[in-house]
Amino acid sequence: MIVTEKVKFISNWIKAYTDNMPNKAQSLVIGISGGIDSSVSSTLSAMTGLKTIVLSMPIKQKSFQHDLSMKHQEWLLKKFNNVEAHTINLDELFRAFSHSLSNFDNEHGFANPRARIRMTSLYQVAAA
């Protein structure tokens, strides 16, 4: 199977999966970081034709990382008319969280909460 066929196959599979849900999905929600995984996932989601909500959620991001996310967000908006894009800055929320646990400061320990805060934000948007 050539790449374009694989892309179409995966996008069609996502659409078929949502069509066969007991409560049919009205939209897809994807967090975008500017990395390859979220770029591919968000593009495949947009290709389904379903409303696709993409969220950039910076937490202690280096500017070049956030810039990649924003460039991909802009590209999606230009290429697909079913994409809705939002930036949710989670820096202040994470600062409050880490401050409340300042007696237990450990950079490795704080890596997982960043992912969980983003995950919770995705759940909230998807539930709305």
Can you name each region flagged by the protein language model?
Residues 1-128:
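ATP-dependent adenylation/nucleotidyltransferase module used to activate substrates
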